[in-house]
Amino acid sequence: RQSLGVPPQVKGPFQVVRPPLRTSVNSYTLPILQYIRALPLEVITNAFQISLEEAR
């Protein structure tokens, strides 16, 4: 029984660790993407023009 009990304990932590990593990445990336999508094109183009002018 001990030999059968070891693999689940080894697999368990990995299965528990992976989802939080994915959710943490999504929690950071999704709001940013939604915020960028919510911005009007004029704001984005103005930001690019300002960045280009500063680069010059």
Curated annotation (Swiss-Prot):
The keyword Transmembrane helix does not apply. Keywords: Allergen, Disulfide bond, Phosphoprotein, Seed storage protein, Storage protein. One of its GO terms (molecular function) is nutrient reservoir activity. This is Cruciferin. Belongs to the 11S seed storage protein (globulins) family. The modification Phosphothreonine is found at residue 45. Hexamer; each subunit is composed of an acidic and a basic chain derived from a single precursor and linked by a disulfide bond. This is a seed storage protein.
